Amino acid sequence: MTTPPALLIAGHGTRDEGGAEALRALVRMLGERHPEVPVAGGFFGAPAAPLPLGDAVDGLVERGATRLAVIPLLPAPTGPVPDALPSALERAAERHPGLGYACGAELGPHPKVLDVLERRLDEALGGGARRPEDRARTTVLLVGRGAADPYANAEVARAARLLWEGRGFAGVETAFVSRAVPDVPTGLDRCRALAAASSARRPGRIVVLPYFFFPGGLLERLRMQAEGWAAAHPRTEVIGAEVIGPEAEVAEAVMERYRATVADDPLLSGASCGCRAAADARATDGTARRTAAAADAGER
């Protein structure tokens, strides 16, 4: 029986042990659900990450893997991906001649990810059965990492629109922790303006929703910025929501990306990764296409 390509989950670097444990939990979940597929995960783009991507590659090779389908665990394409992820994979492949790999698309605002974001909002509002008016007086600030790449920032705006559609919230605004505007305080100002439409007897409130998969330094910076703004605006209720986390829906979305990557490049032959080339070859829906052929054409 032929062993299927291994699944390598690539998270953007964190030095936070909580983020590393969340990735481990997702890897365990996928391994339990799909025992036929070798699974590992690691971080790229940050020195001294607790789970280096290269170690994850080494571990899969030790388990007999010769082909890898790499899925970037990112809510949106970020600036470092076109360089940092292929570079990390190339360094790992140099240690393992003959290793083949192909890079799939990031998760983005996948419907299953949106389901988790909606659940995080309900949890922040107290959970349980809620009346439509509870959402109607709630404005959401969806906060992304922020990048120099405008396509990455546009993906956050797209996620905000999809999250708002049909869910009954007063509005969903966007902000970024760094490297892009609006920043968190400006985003909260915009949410406050939307909330001002609520009656004086039932004032509006803001839920700050991190568009991150795992906890880490970015989440801490976001919380500090939101808490500072809230302290300066005591009449506005500001509630912090949790990160997406290693949920079953995330595991399902990862497997969808895995299957699509294998189907697009069934042989997964040759050490190639289209993450760099994809920055200039985006699909019409805004998703970056990553193909081995594109990488072979100009990224050797």
Model-derived features: positions:
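Active-site-proximal alpha-helix that buttresses catalytic centers in soluble enzyme cores
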Residues: M1-R300
